[in-house]
Each structure stands twice: as C-alpha cells, then as structure tokens.
Amino acid sequence: VAMIANRGRIVRPRLVLSRGERSVPVLQRSMPETTSNLTEEDWQKMVAAMEDVVHLGGQGFRRNGTAWAYIGQRIGYRMAGKSGTAQVVEIRQGEEYDEEELSEFSRKHAWFMAFAPVDDPQIALAVLVENGGGGSSVAAPVARKIIDSYLGRSVTMR
C-alpha cells in the first residue's frame, strides 16, 4: 500500500534496536528507491480508482465506491482504499448459501487497505478482520478510525 501511496517508490524499513540514552545512532534514513516501470499516468489512474472506492457516492445502486456508504461521508481529507473479501471455505460459483449457517471460522475474511491523505501520504495500512465478512462494511471502518486517529481528526462516523 505504501508503494502505491508513494507512486512506485519504496523505502526499505529499518529496525530500531534501542532508543536509550546512549549516544548510539538510532536510524539511518533510507532513500526511496523506484521499483516500478509504471508511468506517472498509470499511478494517477490507480490512485484515482482507489479514491473512488472511498469518495464516489450518490451515483445510485452499485455505482458508488464500495466503501463510500461505510466511511466516505463526513471525511475531511482524501483517502484512497481498496476493499476485499477472502473466501475461507470453497463455495462453488453461483451456489446459494446462508452465511449465518456457516460456522464462525468458515466465514469470509474482511480486508481493507488504504492510505491518506492522497496528495501527501502520511499513513498506509492494511486491515484484516478474520471471519469478519465484507471488507467495506467491516474492515474499512477500522481503517478509517485508525487513519482519523493518526491524522489527529475526531472520529465521527455514522
């Protein structure tokens, strides 16, 4: 997610072993490395599509962003996100089933990855709620609360 937020540049993480009082250098700053052959236009399209997941609303049934109804309203910054749902047990395509009848551990995993603010990314994250259900309805609100908190915004969602 951070690589998308940085439009193809990745900063290698460093491990901090100590932040004690000793005069030991804590971090050595990494320089971003470009690790992609995508063009700036490609990155802009990808980020715009991820913004729509959160912010595209009022378009009618099945035309809104998948997370708009859950997190895209009353948000004071631009967030880019991607929802996902991972099936845990095999259910054939087109097969009818009642998720409530499945054991809790057979229910779908809810995923949501996001970064914000879009124009100056400061946080990137991925949320997984095991056996939680839909990514937009379950994992996206968790991501929104974390990002709101990180950016110092009050968390007011419906």
Enumerate the language-model features and the residues they cover:
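A structural-propensity feature for long, helix-poor, extended segments
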Residues: 40-41
